[in-house]
Amino acid sequence: MASAELRIINRRIKSVKSTKKITRAMELIASSRIVKAQQRLTSSNNYTNLLTQIVEELTGSGEMPTSPAIEGTKKITLVVITSDRGLAGAYNTNILKLAEIRKGEYENLGNQVEIVTVGKKANGYFKYRNVEPKQNYEGITDEPNFENALQIMTPLVEEFYEGKTNQIELVYTEYQSAMTQTALYKTVLPFEVEQIAKEIESVGGYTFEPSASQVLSNIIPKYTNATIFSALLNASTSEHAARMRAMKAATENAEELIKILSRQSNQARQAEITTEISEIVGGAEALAG
């Protein structure tokens, strides 16, 4: 009996050690990827912040982009950015919860909401709930590039100016540090002056030629593309950070479980030895008697 128990425990130890090797490897991979992702995010933020300064000045001049008026229901497009893969803790769960909240809030006001998903997790989530995304993009979130941003945003901006949608909103995870990432939403179009003002203090002193309106029409595509690209980079960096933490926690849990199972193995081995000694002593006494 003790021998059978010992074999079971040892098999579990072997299995947990194998799992630990995998989680440790995934932790190291995520750790290496996050460094590169942070560098790309920092570079992107410099460009995005400059565009934000200019847009703030333009919107402050009274020039605001608008969607053609639509009678009746207002149309909202939510761009939900998740990952293609799991094993990233609550990363995807937090985003999808927020997306559901935003969708519900808009629908409760009588608006029509369309979903654009980035990442397999978002696509699978909404399809499972009988919500067919208008468009789905996969294979982007690991290492997004500017072409991905153009691919996502260009048709949406066209729809905005054609009156097919009145508002474009991103739902994604903002990277703050390796330990802190926050799920949030951000309106891309129409511009929200207060939101832009909070993001960065206006430097002032711009003179627009030939007019603020013409400059704005030229800069809107750059601004919207930079905004979605920044969101993709934030999401990617946050995903790597979340996966690194999740795999680190899994590795530590595996180490703790191995310690517990090793103690159980030692106890089972001691019990087996004690039983064998008792059987030998008992047999010797029987022969002597």
Language model segments and positions:
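C-terminal beta-strand-loop-alpha-helix "lid" module of Rossmann-like NAD(P)-dependent dehydrogenases
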Residues: M1-G289
